[in-house]
Structures are given as C-alpha cells and as structure tokens.
C-alpha cells in the first residue's frame, strides 16, 4: 500500500521509507499514483544501505520491482519528488544526476 510519495506499507505490516526520496509540494498525488501503478500486484525487492534507519527510526530501503526496475531512481526521474540531501547514502550522487 502506498502511504505517501516516500512511504509504503508492505503486506507483512512493515512500513518502509524510500531511501533518497523527499516529497515535493504540489506533486504528492502524482507521485502516489505513479507508485500505485508501478506496484500494482507486483513483487518488490528491498535493498538496504549502510544506514538502515533514519533519525526517526524509519526503515529506509531502495525498492526494486521483479523486473529490476529501480523505483527510487525512476520516481526521481519523473520529477514528482525531490532528492533527499540532508544525509549521505550510497546512491545520493546518482539520484542528484537523475533529477537534472
């Protein structure tokens, strides 16, 4: 279930935050609809970075579809979200390039 542009709820009840994704004003609905369309009855895979939790104890993940689509990066490319730049993570520079 898509909760927000950067949060999803898994079938097992675990809430995860899409690592590197920051909500963008006026594009929340577009981002949520994009994620709902991409996740529609598909299996997803989670990949963790060196830091698994943020300062608010949110579990942070990179999300991939079964066809290896990198959801975090694809979402940034749509322009519906911004790149989180307040802390370091391994895909930060890649995400910044994708946002340009």
Predicted feature descriptions by range:
Residues 1-100:
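Small beta-barrel nucleic-acid-binding modules, primarily SNase/OB-fold domains
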């Amino acid at each position: 279930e898509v909760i927000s542009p950067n949060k999803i709820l898994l079938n097992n009840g675990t809430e995860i935050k899409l690592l590197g994704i920051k909500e963008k004003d006026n594009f929340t609905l577009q981002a949520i609809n994009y994620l709902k369309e991409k996740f529609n009855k598909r299996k997803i895979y989670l990949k963790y970075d060196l830091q698994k939790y943020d300062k608010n104890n949110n579990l942070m993940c990179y999300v991939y579809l079964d066809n290896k689509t990198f959801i975090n990066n694809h979402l940034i490319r749509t322009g519906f979200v911004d790149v989180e730049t307040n802390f370091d993570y391994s895909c930060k520079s890649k995400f910044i390039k994708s946002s340009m």
